[in-house]
Amino acid sequence: VIGADILKRGNIKLMKKMNTSLIIREFNSNGPLSRADLTESTGLSPTTITTLIDEMIKDNLIMRVGEGESSGGRKPILLDLNPKHGYILSGWISGESISIALLDIKYNITDIIEKEIIFPTDENLIPEIKTIIEEIISSNNISNEKVLGLMLGISGIINQQNGTIKYSALLDLENYSIREPLSKYFSFPINIENDTNLAALSEKEFGHKHLSNYIYLMIAPEIGSGIIFDNEIYRGRFGRAGEFGHLLMEKDGPRCTCGKKGCLAPVLSQYIPINKAQKFRNAFKDLEPGSKKYEKFCDYLAVALTNYIHLIDNEAIIFGGELVKVASEKFYSDIEAKIKKYSMKNMYDNVRVLPASLSDNEVIMGGASFCFHNSKYFKNKEG
């Protein structure tokens, strides 16, 4: 009987936590909302909504933000998350710089620091990250306790479980620990993820929310892909899925940063420089549709994407990175036409080619989403 009583109390506590998480998610996606809005959108009873909202207001997690339209009676009180209740640190270590942003729990970027780091090494990378974090926390008067977590997006093969870069050709780092050394200085959770996976996640949270199976392509300042499969990041058994830039296109082609020959990244770089953002934008703008360079660039890209589609059977291809800032509608239609030409009959039906919804800070926004949804607000465990 005692055991059953403990189990019952535990189940009630867990259900309360799950319902609270559901309400927070609803505010985060659709706020501000009234209590009646929440009852309708969550399916929870008015009594449950009132009880939980009262507790969240008491904890300063929810705040009153105004009044809604009346349908014939008292105007409903509109509520929303208190953005200052918690903060998220989210960053991107690219081949050119380290960018770390401070965001509130409404995903507003309140500050961002970017520092150029041309040659990251075992010796200078961790101190550089530590310095930026300390600077952004200090200048915004945020305590460590207010930070829900840090997410860093990094090019390469990442071990999320132990916070280690298994291998990054772009950064020339192997078996390099990020979480362990940073945890000596900061008490909040520290996570790392492949940068293009985070960019793909940003589309799920902030852009093409209705899509559940798609490939996100980052084109410049690197070439990579993130795969969203059934609404989740698909990493593969060993975290190596999505290395789009290292698809073999020419067995005796130009040498890649990974040391091999003929990867897609160096093959495409023969026509447009990929690994420097500004150089890529300038070169792409100067590229004439129909020119030999343009056709070669689009051809190789379309062939690689055709192979992807044949393997994965996705519903969309989303282009991101620097390319989305300079590509015209003609580019997307040209890629689409070439994929249709190269793909097997019926394989390309219903697959769409789309520009990314976010053209800036897509890795940072995806990282913020990951941090928030893995924070204390969403840990559906007892205690």
Where in the sequence are the language-model features?
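Short, active-site-adjacent cap segments at secondary-structure transitions
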Residues: 70, 156-160, 198-200, 224-225, ...
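Glycine-rich phosphate-binding loop and adjoining helix at the ATP-binding site
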Residues: 113-213, 330-341
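ATP-binding/phosphotransfer module of carbohydrate and carboxylate kinases, centering on a glycine-rich
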Residues: 1-145, 252-255, 260-383
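Short, surface-exposed charged micro-motifs
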Residues: 78, 90, 157, 189, ...
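Glycine/GP-enriched mid-protein hinge/lid loop-to-helix segment characteristic of carbohydrate kinases
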Residues: 112-114, 121, 174, 185-290
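Short glycine-aspartate micro-motif
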Residues: 88-92, 147-151, 214-218, 224-226
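Short, acidic, Ser/Thr-enriched surface-loop or helix-capping motifs
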Residues: 104, 160, 228
